[in-house]
Amino acid sequence: MKVLVVGSGGREHAIVTSISKSDKVSKIYCAPGNAGIAALAECVDIGVMDFDRLVAFAKEKEIDLVVVAPDDPLVAGAVDAFEAAGIRAFGPRANAAIIEGSKAFSKDLMKKYGIPTAAYENFTDADSALKYLETASFPIVLKADGLALGKGVLICNDLEEAKAGVKEIMLDKHFGSAGNTMVIEEFMTGREVSVLCFCDGTTIKPMTSAQDHKRAKDGDQGLNTGGMGTFSPSPFYTKEIDEYCMENIYKPTMAAMKAEGREFKGVLFCGLMMTPNGVKVLEYNARFGDPEAQVVLPRMKNDIIDVMEACIDGTLDKVDLQFEDNAAVCVVLASDGYPVSYKKGYPISGLEKFDGKDDYFVFHAGTKFDGDQIVTNGGRVLGVTAKGKDLFEARANAYAATEWITFENKYIRSRRSAPPVR
């Protein structure tokens, strides 16, 4: 079969890597792809939001399955566009992807169906938000309602910070129209964990757990980013917690979406907080996480095509999801200055050192070809993933492998700053 993957980052490189292992697949295309993906797939210069050209390409090449990976096209209806043209597509339709596309929608859904989450209020005008904050307890969390590249969340320690946050999100439109509505949420404490789940509209099957580091700087300081590294599994996500989440979060979320006429098929990313008062939902995403996919997919034993087709066909209940009994750690190699401002176009060397090494992966995020040289082309440049028998070995292997790669403004969070893995 012929597969088209839509996207261009490290997540898409991990997805393409998994698809390339399937005996069922004869040809992979990726639109637009990147310099690393080009080693496994034919990259096509079509943007992720150019639905007309994507559909036309899929028809022309007689694509059997399209995998839509990023949030923007999913929320905008990419799967709907492919399905309308009679092309099988993996991912939620727009009316289900709203669970990520609108934080206000997802919070209201959880409230309506009794799914545990933080207390919150939604606001559509800045004055009301500012008035609410006058009597609020701090710290408090402000969230832009719409998509903001994973950066539309502000944790405010006092009223002054919160006022500045309202101005940034709602008045200055720092996140564009994503800030037309804003969610103000109680600040939760505890350990965060991410659980990606395959869904077929009725059945939901969690993958192995993961935990990511969002802060840009060492010691969990600096601005929130799309993710500076991640590890899997989370040692804090126990069998008992998994069973609780299945009965109180995962299954109820699937049932809630179905009851709302928004059947969810694809990958549901559940961002959870393990608080002193139990596990609560921080956020939902309607797709594989980045960089979570880069540690979860390398540990999956199943043929990913079998699982994706089961999600589309509504037969996920017949799939036995299996993961290796080991660990994986991904360290992001970023451009110094990310996520604010950074230079790009620097040549990258050492990529060939990953060739033929089964338990080491280098997933390209912000790279491109400059002639026949691979150069940096983004804030998050590469994700170096390594496996090990446990998290300690995997982390040591991953940090050792980051030394194999050099480029001029390379930045990683130091091993010393990585949160403990026990």
Feature-to-residue mapping (PLM):
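ATP-binding N-terminal substructure of ATP-dependent carboxylate-amine bond-forming enzymes
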Residues: M1-A94
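Active-site nucleotide/adenylate-binding loops and adjacent lid/helix of ATP-dependent enzymes
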Residues: L4-V5, E100-T181, Q211, P235, ...
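Active-site "cap" helix and flanking loop/linker of ATP-utilizing ligase/carboxylase catalytic domains
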Residues: M246-L268, N285-K357, D370
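Short, charged, surface-exposed secondary-structure boundary motifs
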Residues: A38-A41, V55, I98-A104, K217-D218
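Solvent-exposed alpha-helices and their adjacent loops that cap or buttress functional pockets
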Residues: K21, G36-A38, E60, F90, ...
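Internal nucleotide-binding/catalytic subdomain
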Residues: C156-A293
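Generic C-terminus detector
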Residues: T367-G371, V375-R422
